[in-house]
Curated annotation (Swiss-Prot):
Family: Belongs to the universal ribosomal protein uS4 family.
SMART domains: Ribosomal_S4 (SM01390), S4 (SM00363)
Gene: rpsD
PROSITE patterns: RIBOSOMAL_S4 (PS00632), S4 (PS50889)
Single GO BP term: translation
Lineage of producing organism: Bacteria, Pseudomonadati, Pseudomonadota, Gammaproteobacteria, Thiotrichales
Biological role stated in the UniProt entry: One of the primary rRNA binding proteins, it binds directly to 16S rRNA where it nucleates assembly of the body of the 30S subunit. With S5 and S12 plays an important role in translational accuracy.
GO CC, alphabetical: small ribosomal subunit
Protein name (Swiss-Prot/TrEMBL): Small ribosomal subunit protein uS4
NCBIfam families per the UniProt record, alphabetical: PRK05327.1 (NF003717), rpsD_bact (TIGR01017)
Gene Ontology molecular functions: rRNA binding; structural constituent of ribosome
Length: 206
Protein backbone atom coordinates (compact mmCIF):
# COMPACT_ATOMS: atom_id res chain seq x y z
CA UNK A 1 0.00 0.00 0.00
CA UNK A 2 1.36 3.41 -1.01
CA UNK A 3 1.84 6.24 1.45
CA UNK A 4 -1.08 8.70 1.60
CA UNK A 5 -0.29 12.00 -0.10
CA UNK A 6 -3.69 13.71 0.08
CA UNK A 7 -5.01 16.45 2.40
CA UNK A 8 -3.85 16.00 6.00
CA UNK A 9 -7.04 17.51 7.42
CA UNK A 10 -9.04 14.75 5.78
CA UNK A 11 -7.24 12.12 7.84
CA UNK A 12 -7.80 13.97 11.11
CA UNK A 13 -11.47 14.50 10.27
CA UNK A 14 -11.87 10.81 9.48
CA UNK A 15 -10.57 9.88 12.93
CA UNK A 16 -12.45 12.70 14.65
CA UNK A 17 -9.36 13.96 16.46
CA UNK A 18 -6.23 15.98 15.76
CA UNK A 19 -3.50 13.62 14.51
CA UNK A 20 -0.91 16.43 14.66
CA UNK A 21 -0.19 16.08 10.95
CA UNK A 22 -0.01 19.85 10.40
CA UNK A 23 2.39 22.42 11.75
CA UNK A 24 0.15 23.99 14.36
CA UNK A 25 0.61 27.55 13.08
CA UNK A 26 -3.17 27.90 13.32
CA UNK A 27 -5.58 26.22 15.67
CA UNK A 28 -6.69 22.90 14.22
CA UNK A 29 -10.37 23.83 14.21
CA UNK A 30 -9.54 26.81 11.97
CA UNK A 31 -8.07 24.50 9.35
CA UNK A 32 -10.22 21.37 9.63
CA UNK A 33 -13.92 20.77 10.24
CA UNK A 34 -13.15 18.35 13.06
CA UNK A 35 -16.78 17.87 14.07
CA UNK A 36 -17.67 16.16 10.77
CA UNK A 37 -16.10 13.31 8.82
CA UNK A 38 -14.99 13.96 5.22
CA UNK A 39 -17.36 13.22 2.35
CA UNK A 40 -20.95 13.98 1.38
CA UNK A 41 -22.44 12.27 4.44
CA UNK A 42 -19.74 13.28 6.88
CA UNK A 43 -22.17 14.98 9.24
CA UNK A 44 -23.53 11.57 10.23
CA UNK A 45 -20.87 9.29 11.69
CA UNK A 46 -21.76 5.61 11.50
CA UNK A 47 -22.07 3.66 14.74
CA UNK A 48 -19.16 1.24 14.82
CA UNK A 49 -19.05 -2.35 16.04
CA UNK A 50 -16.34 -3.45 18.48
CA UNK A 51 -14.29 -4.66 15.53
CA UNK A 52 -14.87 -1.37 13.73
CA UNK A 53 -13.63 0.57 16.76
CA UNK A 54 -10.50 -1.57 16.85
CA UNK A 55 -9.83 -0.95 13.16
CA UNK A 56 -10.35 2.80 13.56
CA UNK A 57 -7.95 2.94 16.50
CA UNK A 58 -5.28 1.12 14.54
CA UNK A 59 -5.77 3.46 11.58
CA UNK A 60 -5.63 6.50 13.84
CA UNK A 61 -2.31 5.53 15.43
CA UNK A 62 -0.82 4.41 12.11
CA UNK A 63 -1.69 7.75 10.55
CA UNK A 64 -0.47 9.68 13.55
CA UNK A 65 3.00 8.13 13.24
CA UNK A 66 2.93 7.85 9.44
CA UNK A 67 3.48 4.09 9.33
CA UNK A 68 2.21 1.56 6.80
CA UNK A 69 0.34 -1.55 7.94
CA UNK A 70 3.15 -4.07 7.37
CA UNK A 71 5.60 -2.13 9.50
CA UNK A 72 2.98 -1.40 12.14
CA UNK A 73 2.23 -5.11 12.49
CA UNK A 74 5.95 -5.77 13.02
CA UNK A 75 5.93 -3.30 15.92
CA UNK A 76 3.04 -5.21 17.48
CA UNK A 77 4.88 -8.54 17.07
CA UNK A 78 8.00 -7.07 18.68
CA UNK A 79 5.97 -5.54 21.53
CA UNK A 80 4.21 -8.85 22.20
CA UNK A 81 7.57 -10.62 22.53
CA UNK A 82 8.80 -8.28 25.23
CA UNK A 83 7.98 -8.46 28.92
CA UNK A 84 5.45 -6.05 30.36
CA UNK A 85 2.30 -4.43 29.02
CA UNK A 86 2.11 -5.03 25.26
CA UNK A 87 0.14 -1.85 24.55
CA UNK A 88 2.52 0.39 26.47
CA UNK A 89 5.50 -1.32 24.83
CA UNK A 90 3.97 -0.77 21.38
CA UNK A 91 3.67 2.96 22.03
CA UNK A 92 7.20 3.03 23.45
CA UNK A 93 8.55 1.51 20.21
CA UNK A 94 6.64 4.05 18.12
CA UNK A 95 7.77 6.98 20.25
CA UNK A 96 11.39 5.79 20.10
CA UNK A 97 11.54 6.00 16.30
CA UNK A 98 14.16 8.52 15.21
CA UNK A 99 11.71 10.59 13.17
CA UNK A 100 9.36 10.84 16.15
CA UNK A 101 12.18 11.77 18.54
CA UNK A 102 13.30 14.52 16.13
CA UNK A 103 9.70 15.80 16.14
CA UNK A 104 9.39 15.56 19.93
CA UNK A 105 12.64 17.48 20.37
CA UNK A 106 11.18 20.29 18.28
CA UNK A 107 13.55 20.10 15.32
CA UNK A 108 10.61 19.59 12.95
CA UNK A 109 7.04 20.92 12.99
CA UNK A 110 5.47 17.56 12.09
CA UNK A 111 6.50 13.91 12.03
CA UNK A 112 6.40 13.96 8.22
CA UNK A 113 8.80 16.91 8.21
CA UNK A 114 11.01 15.09 10.72
CA UNK A 115 11.07 12.00 8.49
CA UNK A 116 12.15 14.12 5.54
CA UNK A 117 14.88 15.76 7.61
CA UNK A 118 16.22 12.35 8.61
CA UNK A 119 16.07 10.91 5.08
CA UNK A 120 17.93 13.93 3.71
CA UNK A 121 20.76 13.27 6.19
CA UNK A 122 20.10 16.32 8.32
CA UNK A 123 20.25 14.42 11.63
CA UNK A 124 23.06 12.79 13.61
CA UNK A 125 22.79 10.21 16.39
CA UNK A 126 25.76 10.02 18.75
CA UNK A 127 27.87 11.98 16.27
CA UNK A 128 27.06 9.84 13.24
CA UNK A 129 24.65 10.71 10.43
CA UNK A 130 21.56 8.50 10.40
CA UNK A 131 19.07 8.58 7.53
CA UNK A 132 16.76 5.80 8.74
CA UNK A 133 13.50 7.26 10.13
CA UNK A 134 12.57 3.99 11.86
CA UNK A 135 15.89 3.68 13.72
CA UNK A 136 15.25 3.10 17.43
CA UNK A 137 16.67 5.77 19.75
CA UNK A 138 17.77 4.46 23.14
CA UNK A 139 18.18 6.11 26.53
CA UNK A 140 21.45 8.04 26.55
CA UNK A 141 21.51 8.63 22.79
CA UNK A 142 22.25 12.17 21.62
CA UNK A 143 20.27 13.40 18.61
CA UNK A 144 21.49 16.55 16.85
CA UNK A 145 20.80 18.60 13.73
CA UNK A 146 23.77 18.54 11.37
CA UNK A 147 25.65 21.81 11.00
CA UNK A 148 24.71 22.25 7.34
CA UNK A 149 21.00 21.92 8.16
CA UNK A 150 20.86 24.30 11.13
CA UNK A 151 20.25 27.37 8.97
CA UNK A 152 17.14 25.92 7.33
CA UNK A 153 14.18 28.21 7.96
CA UNK A 154 11.81 25.30 8.56
CA UNK A 155 13.97 24.08 11.45
CA UNK A 156 14.14 27.54 12.99
CA UNK A 157 10.35 27.85 12.68
CA UNK A 158 9.86 24.40 14.21
CA UNK A 159 11.98 25.33 17.23
CA UNK A 160 9.81 28.40 17.80
CA UNK A 161 6.62 26.32 17.54
CA UNK A 162 8.00 23.74 19.97
CA UNK A 163 8.30 26.39 22.68
CA UNK A 164 4.51 26.27 22.99
CA UNK A 165 4.42 22.49 23.46
CA UNK A 166 4.47 20.73 26.79
CA UNK A 167 7.98 19.66 27.82
CA UNK A 168 8.55 15.91 28.08
CA UNK A 169 10.44 14.41 31.00
CA UNK A 170 12.19 11.74 28.92
CA UNK A 171 14.06 14.11 26.61
CA UNK A 172 16.41 17.01 27.28
CA UNK A 173 16.83 19.58 24.50
CA UNK A 174 19.31 22.41 23.92
CA UNK A 175 17.64 24.74 21.43
CA UNK A 176 20.81 26.79 21.00
CA UNK A 177 22.97 23.90 19.80
CA UNK A 178 19.97 22.05 18.31
CA UNK A 179 20.74 18.79 20.02
CA UNK A 180 18.93 16.70 22.56
CA UNK A 181 19.38 13.63 24.73
CA UNK A 182 16.87 10.85 25.24
CA UNK A 183 17.09 10.50 29.02
CA UNK A 184 14.83 7.48 29.43
CA UNK A 185 12.18 5.42 27.69
CA UNK A 186 9.07 7.40 26.66
CA UNK A 187 6.56 7.76 29.49
CA UNK A 188 3.03 6.57 28.59
CA UNK A 189 1.51 9.13 30.97
CA UNK A 190 2.90 11.94 28.78
CA UNK A 191 1.55 10.56 25.52
CA UNK A 192 -1.81 11.30 23.94
CA UNK A 193 -4.78 10.33 26.07
CA UNK A 194 -6.75 9.96 22.81
CA UNK A 195 -4.91 6.71 22.07
CA UNK A 196 -6.53 3.50 23.31
CA UNK A 197 -3.75 1.01 22.61
CA UNK A 198 -5.74 -1.84 24.16
CA UNK A 199 -8.12 -1.78 21.19
CA UNK A 200 -5.16 -2.35 18.86
CA UNK A 201 -3.88 -5.25 20.96
CA UNK A 202 -7.35 -6.82 20.92
CA UNK A 203 -7.47 -6.48 17.12
CA UNK A 204 -4.13 -8.17 16.50
CA UNK A 205 -4.55 -10.87 19.13
CA UNK A 206 -7.64 -12.37 17.46
Amino acid sequence: MARYLGPKCKLSRREGTDLFLKSGVKANDEKCKMNTAPGQHGARRARLSDYGLQLRERQKVRRMYGILEGQFKKYYVEASRRKGNTGATLLELLESRLDNVVYRMGFAATRAEARQLVVHKGIMVNGHTCNVPSAQVKAGDVVAVREKAKKQLRIQNAVELAKHRKELSWIDVNTDSLEGTMKSSPDRSELSADINEQLIIELYSK
